[in-house]
Structure formats: C-alpha cells, structure tokens
Amino acid sequence: MNQEDEIKFLQRMVVEGSLSRRKFLAAAMAMGVGSLAPTLYSSAAMAAPKKGGRLRQGLTGGATSDVLDPGQILDSYMINLQFGQIRNNLTEVAASGELVGELAESWEANADATQWVFNIRQGVEFHNGKSLTAQDVVDSLNHHIGEKSGSAASGLLTGVESVKADGGSKVVVKLSGGDADFPFILSDYHILICPSNGDGSIDWKSGIGTGGYVLKEHDAGVRSFTTRNPNYWKEGRAFFDEIESLGLEDPSARTTALRTGAVDCIQKVELKTAGRLGKISGIKVIPTTGNKQVTLPMRTDLAPFDNNHVRMALKLIIQRQDWLDKIAFGYGELGNDNPIGPANIYRATTAELPQREYDPDKAKWHLKQAKMENLSVEFHAADTAFAGAVDAGTLMRESAKAAGINIDVKRQPNDGYWSDVWMKKPWSACYWSGRPTENWIFSQIYAADASWNDTFWKNDKFNKLLVQGRAELNPEKRREIYVEMQKIVNMDGGVALPLFLSDVMAINDKIGHPEQLGNNWELDGMKNVERWWFS
C-alpha cells in the first residue's frame, strides 16, 4: 500500500467513525504528512455520518394488499419497510457478503450441523419498551414453520424439527438433516423477529420491532412514515431522523421525483435513461452487480409447459445478447437458465455448463418431438416484474418466429401483478434478487415443496441432491452436487433465465454512504435507511 492509499484508508476509518482525530493526526505525522494532516482530517470528517434530516425514498413493489406479516412480504416496498427499517433478523449479510450477528450475538453447531445454538443479544428492546427474549425468537421462527404457517419462508425451514428456548438467552434449533448454511437462512427478509403474544403466536399487526426506525404511519403500497428509534441497539447506524417511503411504480415518475427534489433516492432506475440521469448535476447513479436475475417462469403443471420439449424450445428462441443490449443497456450479464449467479461461490463454469445460444432450428426439433410444430403461447408481463419486461416480450416474440412459434405478449397492470399474474398465469415475467447461498435459492424457489416454486416444477433427482448438498460439509463434494443441480435446472427446469441484472439506484449528492455497498439486495442490501446519512 503506497502513501496515498494509506491516507485514503485512514480517511475511510474517520468516515466510518472508527478513528479519532488525535489518532489520525498521529498516524499522519508518522507518515511524514503532518502539515497536511488537519486538512486531510477535516475533509474526511465532513463526509462522516451525521444524524438528522428526513430521507424521502421512491420505492417499487408496493401493493394496497400488503400486510405487516413478515411471512407475507412479496417485494421491494415491504422488504425495505420491514427488513430495512422496523425489524431485525437473527443474522445479517454485511455489505462485504460476510454473515454477521444481528439479534444473535453468536452461534455454534454440533459436528454434523443438525443442531444450532443461537446466543441472543441482551439489552435489546422492542419499540414498545419490551425486552427481547429467547421466547420472542422461538415464536418468531415458528411463525414460518409447519403446513399451516402460510409463510413464504416456510420452504426454507422445512428441515426444522424443533425450536426451543434454553433459558432467557439461548435458542436451540434442531434439524432433520445437516445444514451448513442454516445461519444464512435466518437472514432472510421474512424471518424477522417480532414480540411474542405469550401464546405461541407473534404480534406482527402492530408493526413493532427492534429495528432502527419506529412505524408511525402506513398506507399500504402508497406511503409509510417512520422515525428514528432513540433506543436502537446498533451503534453507528440509523442516522436519519425520519424516513418517508413512497410507492412509485412508474419509472418515469420515480425519475421525475428525484430530479425535482421530491425524493432523495430511488431504486430500479430505468436502464435506458440511467446514463443521462447520471449526468444531471446533483444526482449520482450507482450500479451494483450481484445475483439479481430476470426469469420467465413457465408453469410445468399446465399444458403446454408440462412438456419439457416445449420448455427447451422457448429457452432456445431467446436472443440473450439482444436482451443485454436493448433491455439491460449493458447493465448485467448473460443468464444461462439457472439461478446461481456471479456472486455465488459454487457457480458452474461455462466448461461445466456451456452458455445456451439462440438456436431456432434446435427449437424446431424440440417442438417436433412434442408434436407441437405450430406452437402459440401467451406471455404475461408488466414493468413491475423488471424494467422493460413488456419490451423483452416483444423481442422474444420476434425471435421466436424463426422457430415457427407465435408468442402473444399480454401487457398487465403493475398494480396487483404479484397477486393476480405471477404464479397464476401459465407463463409470465419475474425477477429475483438472488440469494447468498446455493441452498437458499434452490430451497426457496426450485424445491418441489417451496412456497415460491413459481414453475410448480418437481424433479426427484434435483430434490434428493438438494438434501445432500445442504448437509455436505466438504466444499469440493458440495460443489459437485450444486453443479449437477444447475445442470438439471438448465435442461429440465421451468425457468428461462436470460439475464443477470445490475441493481441501479440513484441518489441526490447530499446523501453519504459507506464505500462498500451491499449487493445481496437493492439499495445497499435493503439496509440503506440505517447505513446512509446526509452529508
């Protein structure tokens, strides 16, 4: 590290609040830049987090049907409100991708990872002043377990046999099989800790949590207002006094709101205008690359998608580079009909799983095998699924003609898309933010019993490998299993996955943020509200 890099490192420590003025000046003196030290420190101190102000943000994915039940969280608006503002998990994926403790200070497993003990953080209070206990954690986890739970996270916890409190500060979770990634699962945005009602249920209706902000007003899908929790247990987090979250589904409306100063930050910047937006004075466009993915789920329980030859034909008529250029405007990379992305460690290489290319002749062959040479299908899309989803459908319609396939693109309204179209229509547009581990995304979306198995796909070999991979502690063997699972999804699954997308957000230049931003979800891992500040 040269002197310039060392100075930047010290300044970053000042910004993050981990280096005092005295220590900075002493370090600068030792480096031989003592005369410049006060100026260098002042510039860093000015960028350091400061409390105060109201952050106004334009979010997508809200609906008037949204509820405060964490098990029913569907999209960005409620993820940000519940996961990012008012509640906490046991664990958290840091901006670095490392798993750290949130309401669990630490955890340990037995030798085969079939039992996990979580040590619950002491001195934490809910917004109503109630102290956090192990029983709150037990009831919050059980809220997502069992056939009657109805939680979208139930598929993640099917292997849980029991959750019990061991005194007031320990929670013991026993699993039916080993799961080396189980603590990662508990960072899922559904598995939030709520106060226990004392009868085994939790109080989710009040919106009470342990998070950095307290819910004051909530008009589902339209507007929410929170204020800083004065007793927040995290040091160096939650700097804004107030948060106003607005549901802005239309990308042009979001952009206009930012340009006119009606909001301070927006998510899902319209990719075709991102370059121009970034040139406007006072606005900063920030792309982050992770596992966010465009998917086109086909319901494999309904004709004609119950025939894998049809599914393969539709995967083969997508001109992926066209999508990257014309839909993503270069913000992303090609997908290969499997959900394991660039931020996952066991991703199959192109040598292991060759990139699928546009091949209308091969698509014709598959349709001939299915005896459906003149296939006609409907594709349902709305821009809330992903920016440009309807345009993508049009591109696909044109590229499918060479294979003799007629695709009727049906534009759907943004409002109600996730409740009325996704998982209801036979073929639709969707997106996923990806997951930190292979087991997580496979268990939540591709397992036969997953509540979000939006293709209704069931593959016995895949599901057996899922259990094996989850319990395997040897990294090399684990990789072999997950690569094989990716091949199965690629060749048999009900999802066409053309692209991995960068998350592109835009902020006004008055907002300060850490140098490293989380890429596990949008908006700094959906923790922007507690990680950012006004400069």
Give short role names for the model-derived ranges.
Residues 1-19, 23:
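N-terminal secretory signal peptides
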Residues 58-111, 142, 208-210:
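N-terminal lobe/hinge region of extracytoplasmic solute-binding protein
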Residues 84, 94-98, 186-238, 242-244, ...:
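Gly/Pro-rich hinge or "lid" segments in bacterial periplasmic/extracellular proteins
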Residues 119, 153-196:
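Surface-exposed binding/hinge segments that line
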Residues 231-276, 397-398, 406:
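Ligand-site clamp/hinge motif
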Residues 334-369, 386-389:
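Structural transition elements
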Residues 356, 402, 408-417, 441-509, ...:
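Extracytoplasmic/peripheral linker and loop segments enriched in polar/acidic and small residues
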Residues 507-535:
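Long beta-strand-rich cores associated with HINT superfamily self-processing modules
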